[in-house]
């Protein structure tokens, strides 16, 4: 089958790479336009565009620019494209468009399912392959695979596991798409994972230890959970809840060792392994202590 691939970030490019490695015929790619990045604001290709150009695959920035009458794709594969597909385009491909989504639909429809699942402390999530319709992430399911979430999972580790699962079910599906039955979603069970806002990144140490831990791991390593320290915005990485009792104001550093900073919450203590100060690289709390950048009894603002 001739495949039209729609996707933008590294998450999507790894799925495209799997299709190419399996020998599938990708006749075109739709990806978001180049964006300015870095201090020099140099225009940068998306990871999907980079991979497509490397493999001499035609690249387009929107479906309206794609020559459907000349390239005639049989099926569309969508992975983290970053835009909705209008009905007039849905009808232009014989077999339709199929989307890989990192949640067990109908749960966590929307832009940030991995972050939101971790933030909510989910113990089970997964990957869904479904047929696109006009409504957001609401089309019938083709395949799903469950993925358990352990207490040490971070965004990075869970995303990597999601990618591996997504690559497998996508390649399994494309071996014989006609053999799979579609199953309608139970829309009454739908929940949503809205796009991350800057306010979502901030840690509130007045919450319980589990909530604080989940907030930090949901954005580890990118874009990084935030808090204020002596009026500066800092990022926090790696968190484990260890105690259910303490004394002291939430956000107070009560101890620092090679495991990290022991910080009070509303109901206990959480160990945070790394900190990143503005214009600095990530470092251990012990390094920050030795560099006199912080000390025991300092407090993060909530």
From Swiss-Prot:
Q: Which InterPro entries match?
A: Fmt, Formyl_trans_C, Formyl_transf_N, Formyl_transf_N_sf, Formyl_transferase-like_C_sf, Met-tRNA-FMT_C, Met-tRNA-FMT_N
Give its E.C. classification number.
2.1.2.9
Q: Name one GO molecular function term.
A: methionyl-tRNA formyltransferase activity
What keywords are assigned to this protein? Protein biosynthesis, Transferase
Which reaction(s) does the protein catalyse, per the Swiss-Prot or TrEMBL entry?
L-methionyl-tRNA(fMet) + (6R)-10-formyltetrahydrofolate = N-formyl-L-methionyl-tRNA(fMet) + (6S)-5,6,7,8-tetrahydrofolate + H(+)
Q: Which GO terms describe its cellular component?
A: cytosol
Pfam family, any one? Formyl_trans_C
Residues that bind (6S)-5,6,7,8-tetrahydrofolate, according to the entry? 103-106
Listed transmembrane segments: none
Can you tell me which family this protein belongs to?
Answer: Belongs to the Fmt family.
Q: Which NCBIfam families match?
A: fmt (TIGR00460)
What's the stated role of this polypeptide? Attaches a formyl group to the free amino group of methionyl-tRNA(fMet). The formyl group appears to play a dual role in the initiator identity of N-formylmethionyl-tRNA by promoting its recognition by IF2 and preventing the misappropriation of this tRNA by the elongation apparatus.
Please give the name of this protein. Methionyl-tRNA formyltransferase
Q: Which organism is it from?
A: Pseudothermotoga lettingae (strain ATCC BAA-301 / DSM 14385 / NBRC 107922 / TMO) (Thermotoga lettingae)
State the gene name recorded for this protein.
fmt
């Amino acid at each position: 089958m001739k495949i039209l691939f729609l996707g933008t970030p590294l998450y999507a490019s790894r799925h495209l790479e799997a299709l190419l490695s399996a020998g599938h015929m990708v006749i075109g790619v739709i990806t978001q336009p180049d964006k300015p990045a870095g201090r020099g604001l140099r225009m940068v290709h998306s990871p999907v565009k980079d991979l497509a150009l490397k493999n001499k695959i035609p690249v387009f920035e929107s479906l309206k620019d794609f020559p459907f009458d000349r390239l005639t794709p049989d099926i569309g594969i969508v992975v983290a494209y970053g835009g909705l597909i209008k009905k007039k385009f849905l009808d232009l491909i014989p077999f339709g468009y199929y989307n890989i989504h990192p949640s067990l639909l109908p749960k966590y429809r929307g832009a940030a399912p991995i972050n939101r699942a971790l933030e909510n402390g989910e113990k089970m999530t997964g990957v869904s392959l479904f047929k696109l319709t006009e409504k957001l992430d609401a089309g019938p399911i083709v395949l799903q695979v469950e993925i358990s979430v352990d207490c040490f999972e971070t965004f990075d580790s869970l995303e990597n596991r999601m990618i591996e699962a997504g690559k497998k079910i996508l390649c399994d599906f494309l071996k014989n798409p006609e053999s799979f039955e579609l199953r309608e979603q139970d829309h009454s069970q739908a929940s949503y994972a809205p796009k991350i806002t800057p306010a979502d990144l901030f840690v509130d140490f007045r919450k319980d230890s589990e909530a604080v831990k989940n907030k930090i791991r949901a954005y580890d390593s990118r874009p990084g959970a935030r808090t204020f320290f002596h009026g500066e915005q800092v990022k926090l990485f790696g968190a484990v809840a260890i105690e259910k009792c303490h004394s002291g104001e939430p956000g107070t550093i009560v101890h620092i060792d090679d495991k990290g900073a022991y910080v009070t919450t509303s109901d206990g203590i959480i160990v945070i392994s790394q900190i990143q100060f503005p214009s600095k690289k990530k470092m251990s709390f012990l390094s920050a202590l030795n560099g006199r950048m912080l000390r025991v009894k300092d407090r993060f603002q909530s």
